[in-house]
Curated annotation (Swiss-Prot):
Residues 559-571, 587-597 have a biased composition (Basic and acidic residues). The lineage of its organism: Eukaryota, Metazoa, Chordata, Craniata, Vertebrata. The modification Phosphoserine is found at residues 359, 395. This is Rho GTPase-activating protein 22. It comes from Homo sapiens (Human). Residues 549-558 have a biased composition (Low complexity). PROSITE patterns: PH_DOMAIN, RHOGAP. Disulfide bonds: none annotated. Pfam families: PH, RhoGAP. One of its GO terms (cellular component) is nucleus. Residues 590-687 form a coiled coil. The gene is ARHGAP22. GO terms for biological process: angiogenesis; cell differentiation; negative regulation of small GTPase mediated signal transduction; regulation of postsynapse organization; regulation of small GTPase mediated signal transduction; signal transduction. Rho GTPase-activating protein involved in the signal transduction pathway that regulates endothelial cell capillary tube formation during angiogenesis. Acts as a GTPase activator for the RAC1 by converting it to an inactive GDP-bound state. Inhibits RAC1-dependent lamellipodia formation. May also play a role in transcription regulation via its interaction with VEZF1, by regulating activity of the endothelin-1 (EDN1) promoter.
């Protein structure tokens, strides 16, 4: 019999041991909801430090803290583990714990990954399966090593690019570039590249090394298939694929359109590609270009475009909910879409990303960037210099969609020079050339986008054509002035007409996004730039350049005659404006202003009407598609209900037949029982009468 003091001491000791399980991490428990979203959650078994028994707890990973709860629905956690300065280690099952999936979280930072000390402060956890344990270990390592440059497997692409920005501008993460460079150097002629799997243990070791912030180097002893499997694993474990989940249906629609009309589908696909986030755009372009290099050796490595599309399609383009029905329905479309992305990558990715910032030089400069393009021309014109230098012939394929913009400084002290202009390329197929001198030609396949370099202010006219008709040299005494000064701005010569083409924003940077967006306002766009006019007519006549219009794939066939007539009227108006100079430069003709305003108003109305009609048609088609989808769902639901009713009817018929048979059997049994009762009573009566007769003679 223990005394009360001993019992009280034991209770206090056991209570302190239990409470010690909750206070493993020193410091005050942080609020879980303030640490961001849940990175991972699930059931794990935790071993107590003293009693060594297992307790099942609900673990939640938020930020750099691992909380555990008694139940899934609990709000207040029982305890937490701070992952800063810790390491996670997988433990092999021992003789005492056979078949258990154990891992340990113990103190230790970078450089101590290979050490597994027997630390009494380590937390031993057990998962329900090997896959569950691997997922938990990867998630915890990602949290531990992400601030140190690791944990890239399963990390969002934007976060990886943002962290690696300190190493300089890159088109893809360092892991992808390292794998691609190694395969490009040693594996392009390897048979079955990307199809044959690598060594699983080596892939796992490389993944752990990259996740722990290390940068392992590949040498001649490294297996090419292992590196290829590592690259596929990185793409597969991205939380959101290269093509985001929100764009999955849009890209599948492009694939369906490609099967019907390849030209329209390619144009729509280029538009969807250009709308991707910049990190996704760069990585997709990098991978497609590399896969095109791989398929160039298909006669040796046996990996054609279709094979590469089959391997990489599900890793680059996958639905958010990966159910078997959705995957089976989209497999062929994804493969076809990936094939087009590889084959036509030079046409679809037309805006190259600059390698890095370049220092401005004293001559002509042309910089083309993803999502933006600017043509900067130095305005250091010499008096009496040559009239027009040779320029390049540039063509923009109809499938190329580039959104090009530049911001010009404004202010009371800023000047607009004719030597520095912003040019925006539309989505029409166009070309411009000078019949006398050509210094370059467009590259085949639209793999690169060449921008004309002109010594004086260039023009973009209606269908994206650059007309040199308005280029004039300023004489030696001419100087640039503001828009309200002596020299007046010509709408046709020096600025793109705002609202004429959806792909051409005005000088005030008013964007026109697709045919479904509203038209940009044209007011006030003519007063943000100045123009240079020449002083002699000989210079004007020498600067005349012809331009030719190629067929432009407009969305509506009824729009072509109006556009051609409008082009012709604009050409005549521009020629008349350039040949008929006013006698005094500071007194512009009112007729010219009225004509330009009328043409601008007409074009704006036509574009607005077309935009409105197209928007209505798209809404109607969308409503019809939604109604059709609802009807199909209702039909399928009614068919299911009809099948159920048929089954119920059959069951009722069977029950009815069974009940009839049971009733007939019951009637037969009743009749038989009635006959037996009658026989019994008759026999009983005869026996009674016989007994009475036998007693009577006595």
């Amino acid at each position: 019999m223990l005394s009360p003091k001993i019992r009280q001491a034991r209770r206090a000791r056991s209570k302190s041991l239990v409470m010690g399980e909750q206070s493993r991490s020193p410091g005050r428990m942080p609020c879980p909801h303030r640490l961001g979203p849940v990175l991972k959650a699930g059931w794990l078994k935790k071993q107590r430090s003293i009693m060594k028994n297992w307790q099942q707890r609900w673990f939640v990973l938020r930020g750099d803290q691992l909380f555990y709860y008694k139940d899934k629905d609990e709000i207040k956690p029982q305890g937490f583990i701070s992952l800063q300065g810790t390491q996670v280690t997988e433990l092999p099952p021992g003789p005492e714990d056979p078949g258990k999936h154990l891992f340990e979280i113990s103190p230790g930072g970078a450089g101590e990954r290979e050490k597994v000390p027997a630390n009494p402060e380590a937390l031993l956890l057990m998962a329900s399966s090997q896959r569950d344990m691997e997922d938990w270990v990867q998630a915890i390592r990602r949290v531990i090593w992400a601030p140190l440059g690791g944990g890239i497997f399963g990390q969002r692409l934007e976060e990886t690019v943002h962290h690696e920005r300190k190493y300089g501008p890159r088109l893809a993460p360092l892991l992808v570039e390292q794998c691609v460079d190694f395969i490009r150097e040693r594996g392009l002629t390897e048979e079955g590249l990307f199809r044959m799997p690598g060594q699983a243990n080596l892939v796992r070791d490389l993944q752990d090394s990259f996740d722990c912030g290390e940068k392992p180097l590949f040498d001649s002893t490294t297996d090419v298939h292992t590196v290829a499997s590592l690259l596929k694993l990185y793409l597969r474990e991205l939380p959101e694929p290269v093509v985001p989940f929100a764009r999955y249906e849009d890209f599948l629609s492009c694939a369906q359109l490609l099967t019907k009309d390849e030209g329209e589908g390619t144009l729509e696909l280029a538009k969807q590609v250009s709308n991707l986030p910049q990190a996704n755009y760069n990585l997709l372009r990098y991978i497609c270009k590399f896969l095109d290099e791989v398929q160039a050796y298909s006669n040796v490595n046996k990996m054609s475009v279709q094979n590469l599309a089959t391997v990489f399609g599900p890793n680059i383009l996958r639905p958010q909910v990966e159910d078997p029905v959705t995957i089976m329905e989209g497999t062929s479309l994804v493969q076809h879409l990936m094939t087009v992305l590889i084959r036509k990558h030079s046409q679809l990715f037309t805006a190259p990303v600059p390698e890095g910032p370049t220092s401005p030089r004293g001559g002509l400069q042309c910089a083309v960037g993803w999502g933006s393009e600017e043509v900067t021309r130095d305005s250091q014109g010499e008096p009496g210099g040559p009239g027009l230098p040779a320029h390049r012939t540039s063509s923009l394929d109809g499938a190329a969609v580039a959104v090009l913009s530049r911001t010009a400084p404004t202010g009371p002290g800023s000047r607009c020079s004719p030597g520095k202009k912003v040019q925006t390329l539309p989505s029409w197929k166009s070309s411009f050339r000078q019949p006398r001198s050509l210094s370059g030609s467009p590259k085949g396949g639209g793999s690169s986008l060449e921008v004309p370099i002109i010594s004086s202010g260039g023009n973009w006219l209606m269908n994206g054509l650059s007309s040199l008709r308005g280029h004039r040299r300023a004489s030696s005494g001419d100087r640039l002035k503001d828009s309200g000064s002596v020299q007046r701005l010509s709408t046709y010569d020096n600025v793109p007409a705002p609202g004429l083409v959806p792909g051409i924003p005005s000088v005030a940077s008013m964007a026109w996004s697709g045919a479904s967006s509203s038209e940009s306002s044209v007011g006030g766009s003519l007063s943000s730039c100045t123009a240079c006019r020449a002083s002699d007519s000989s210079a004007r006549s020498s600067l005349h350049t012809d331009w030719a219009l190629e067929p432009s794939p407009l969305p509506s066939s009824s729009e072509d005659p109006k556009s051609l007539d409008l082009d012709h009227s604009m050409d005549e108006a521009g020629a008349g404006a350039s040949n008929s100079e006013p006698s005094e430069p500071d007194s512009p003709t009112r007729e010219h202003a009225r004509r330009s305003e009328a043409l601008q108003g007409l074009v704006t109305e036509l574009r607005a009407e077309l935009c409105r009609q197209r928007t209505e048609y798209e809404r109607s088609v969308k409503r019809i598609e939604e109604g059709s989808a609802d009807l199909r769902k209702r039909m399928s639901r009614l068919e299911e209900e009809l099948d159920q009713e048929k089954k119920k009817y059959i069951m009722l018929e069977i029950k009815l037949r069974n009940s009839e048979r049971a009733r007939e059997d019951a009637e037969r049994r009743n009749q038989l029982l009635q006959r037996e009762m009658e026989e019994f009573f008759s026999t009983l009566g005869s026996l009674t009468v016989g007994a009475k007769g036998a007693r009577a003679p006595k």
